[in-house]
Curated annotation (Swiss-Prot):
Protein name per the record: Putative zinc protease AlbF
Cofactor section: Zn(2+)
Example of a GO MF term: metal ion binding
Keyword terms, alphabetized: Antibiotic biosynthesis, Bacteriocin biosynthesis, Hydrolase, Metal-binding, Metalloprotease, Protease, Zinc
GO BP annotations listed: bacteriocin biosynthetic process; proteolysis
Pfam families in alphabetical order: Peptidase_M16
Active site: 69 (proton acceptor)
Binding site for Zn(2+): 66, 70, 142
E.C. no: 3.4.24.-
Organism: Bacillus subtilis
Length: 427
């Protein structure tokens, strides 16, 4: 099947409805799936630390969204995981920068029992001071454990070096002082503001049944007429300040280099989804060991690079790239790669085709797995686009777009953590 036709087919298998209370329902049919994946996404994530109201703004401690996620696993004195397990369903939950998610897999004939249980827990929570105290201990331990993960530490340390005031610089669970500061009033205010039907999206992925056949009958569905997609943009970065550098161990024997870059709009382009996809393509070209670009540059400069990776954090309130290179020449890789692109512009189209194929193939491959397919469907929902919109953006990226990203690599504000060989081995 032609790739474009595959993306069109994903859209044809997607049905979007709304309940009369305003909750969005996204149904993605997946004929070969035995189980059904259900995810309730709440538009309240770790970045949401300010509640706005006519009476005034309320500042919340970091980690509030994640704390609520933990609390809502308890309903009427019972643990939701146990209740779902009794129905043959496995319930999980996770908090991201933008939202909170409650996800489970289930046999199709159990959804009419499990979905009402989850929605009742999300819409009718009763706060218990004893449970809050219990979860404070649990989450404090979770934060302490996260600090032992060097990769997580470097990720948040780099963003903190680049933008100390950004919520993105804080682990989603918050800091220990935030958890200690949380009180029942903060949690009640956040819950009352966030856990409303109009801030929720229910994803149903798997099987070929109509949407109504999987949902409890009391959820009356309707189409939303005359919907106009919201164009989400990312602003340009402030002028770069002096780069910051942290060295762990002996600077003469660098083994690992972690680089954070603050990124935003590029000349002529500020669309958030477009830039997310562009950076994904560029990362596949520059930071995959099996890419033609890396093979060429390694042979040309005899680079000793054993590991490369890139992770993008891009949202309306700012963007960051976290790059990791490992090997004797890890600290020089970004500069060498940027220079090589400018010297070999005639090859950009070839490299670009590799990056585009790599990304579209990944989406097609992921669509065979319900959990991965959900992630792409959630991205479409977050950016208010279709699968075909994503394909067109990928297809239309050109050499000048790629060069603009290379310019950003060279000119953006940077934070670098160098880890010496001894420190890296000790980890």
């Amino acid at each position: 099947m032609e790739k474009k036709a595959f993306f069109q087919q994903l859209d044809e298998r997607t049905d979007i409805r709304y309940t009369d209370s305003g909750m969005k329902i996204i149904r993605l049919k997946f004929p070969r799936a035995h189980l059904r994946l259900c995810n309730v996404k709440i538009d309240f994530g770790s970045r949401d630390v300010c509640l706005q109201a006519e009476s005034g703004d309320t500042l919340l401690p970091y980690g509030t969204a994640h704390f609520l996620e933990h609390l809502l696993f308890w309903h009427n004195g019972r643990n939701l995981y146990t209740d779902f397990f009794a129905h043959g369903a496995l319930l999980n939950a996770f908090t991201t920068y933008t939202d909170t998610n409650f996800m489970f897999t289930s046999l199709p004939d159990r959804l009419r029992q499990t979905i009402p249980i989850l929605l009742d827990a999300l819409w009718n929570h009763s706060f218990d001071k004893k449970m809050i105290t219990q979860e404070k201990a649990v989450i404090t331990s979770e934060i302490q454990t996260a600090h032992l993960n060097h990769q997580l530490y470097y990720h948040y340390q780099l963003i903190s070096m680049l933008s100390p005031a950004s919520p993105a610089a804080v682990f989603p669970a918050g800091r220990i002082e935030d958890i200690e500061a949380l009180d029942i009033r903060d949690l009640q205010k956040a819950y009352n503001a966030a856990y409303q039907p109009q801030r929720m999206t229910l994803f149903l992925i798997g099987g070929s049944e109509d949407t109504e056949a999987l949902l409890p009958p009391h959820l009356r569905l309707e189409k939303r007429p005359n919907h106009k997609a919201e164009r989400k943009i990312i602003s340009a970065c402030p002028p770069p300040a002096l780069s910051q550098k942290m060295v762990l161990g002996n600077e003469e024997r660098i083994e690992d280099t972690w680089t954070g870059l603050q990124v935003g709009a590029i000349p002529g382009q500020n669309n958030l989804l477009t830039l997310k996809l562009y950076w994904d393509i560029a990362s596949r070209i520059l930071f995959q060991l099996d890419s033609p670009f890396f093979q060429e540059i390694q042979q040309t400069y005899r680079l000793e690079i054993d590991c490369l990776s890139a992770e993008a954090h891009m949202y309306e309130d700012g963007g960051f790239l976290i790059l990791h290179s490992q090997g004797a020449h890890s600290s020089a890789y970004i500069d060498v790669a940027s220079y090589y692109v400018t010297q070999q512009k005639q090859q950009i189209e070839t490299w670009l085709q590799y990056g585009k194929d790599s990304l579209t193939d990944a989406i097609i491959y992921d669509s065979d797995y319900v959990r991965k397919c959900f992630e792409w469907a959630a991205e479409c929902d977050r950016c208010d686009c279709t699968f075909l919109d994503m394909y067109r953006i990928i297809h239309d990226m050109n050499s000048q777009d790629f060069l603009s990203l290379i310019d950003a690599l060279a000119s953006s504000k940077k934070a670098v953590i160098h880890v010496s060989q001894k420190e890296a081995i000790g980890q």
